[in-house]
Regions:
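Conserved FAD-binding catalytic core of PHBH/FMO-like flavoproteins
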Residues: 128-254, 258, 263-266
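Conserved N-terminal helical subregion
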Residues: 48-163
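Glycine-rich FAD cofactor-binding loop and adjacent beta-loop-alpha segment at the N-terminus
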Residues: 1-72, 78-80, 88-98, 290
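Short, glycine/acidic-enriched loop or turn micro-motifs at the edges of active sites
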Residues: 35, 139, 282
Length: 291
């Protein structure tokens, strides 16, 4: 079976290695537009249940991921001077870059072909495959091209959020709510390696505008967030790794994506299934632990 995965994020890479592991005779290729070690974002989170699923699907990959994970059982909520802790939840964090590198290495070990720095502008060029996986992300070109088949419903939600990082190490899945003169602002933080935590700042759009984030530079916005959430940072600074974004562009409104169908049949005879996967098919909000 010839399989082409368009997009080398976690979904495309993991599907590729599982298919190759299931049958070494499969001809599996992953095509990614970025370089091997280019990635954006900070850490991602998996629940204990998800880790169990990974262990069942491919113990080798799961073992490498588990070695790199930072595990916690507590969720901590901070609001109006109160600290509330709930235990027994079981989550793990890992750096997105590290996760991708583990998946890339496992793909190569199994014989999956990895093609980088290649931008697929016409998915029909790969319609000679028996199966095409459209794992090309949230802003999937393939989903857009065959919109009439997939019939996506994209709902852009109200709140604005920004992905930041810090060297303050949080020992629990931490939610911090701060009531400001402009309204409520929230931080969502978790550790994902020995040195770094993800720190997401979120607020309603009206609060974001009232606080002036719309006209702030990236540096000004970070300084403002450090001031609001300083009590949780213990003197540590906040960091951005979105060097490709400027000013208010680093603030995102969550797009809830669902599709009526995940399969389009392409190629000359319309027999090649082009299947949406990952964020191209559906999105998951970071608050449920899918970083």
């Amino acid at each position: 079976m010839k399989i082409a995965c368009i997009g080398g994020g976690p979904a495309g890479l993991y599907f590729a290695l599982l298919m190759k592991r299931a049958n070494p005779e499969h001809d599996v290729t992953v095509i990614e537009r970025n370089r091997p070690y280019d990635t954006f974002g900070w850490g991602v989170v998996f629940s204990d249940q998800t880790l169990g699923n990974l262990q069942a699907a491919d113990p080798v990959t799961a073992g490498k991921i588990l070695d790199a994970f930072n595990h916690w059982d507590d969720i901590e909520v901070n609001i109006r001077g109160h600290r509330i802790v709930s235990s027994g939840h079981g989550f793990c964090g890992i750096g997105r870059k590290h996760l991708l590198n583990i998946l890339q290495a496992r793909c190569e070990e199994l014989g999956v072909k990895l093609v980088f720095e290649t931008d697929v502008t016409n998915v029909e060029d790969h319609a000679d495959a028996d199966l095409v996986i459209a794992s090309d992300g949230l802003n999937s070109r393939i989903r857009t091209r065959f919109e009439s088949t997939y019939r996506p419903d994209i709902d852009t939600r109200d709140c604005r959020f920004v992905w930041l990082g810090t060297h303050k190490l949080f020992e629990a899945f931490t939610f911090a709510f701060e009531e400001t003169e402009h309204g409520w602002m929230q931080a969502h933080a978790y550790r994902f390696d020995r040195e770094t935590s993800t720190f997401i700042v979120e607020m309603p759009d009206r609060v974001w505008r009232a606080a002036g984030f719309e006209t702030m530079s990236k540096e000004q916005a970070i300084a403002y967030c450090e001031k609001i959430f300083g009590r949780y940072l213990d003197g540590h600074s906040l960091m951005s790794n979105a060097t490709h974004l400027r000013g208010s562009a680093q603030w995102i409104q969550f797009p809830r994506v669902v599709c009526e169908s995940w399969v389009h049949y392409g190629g000359k005879d319309r027999r090649t299934p082009i299947v949406l996967m990952g964020d191209a098919a559906h999105t998951a909000h970071f608050s449920i632990g899918s970083g």
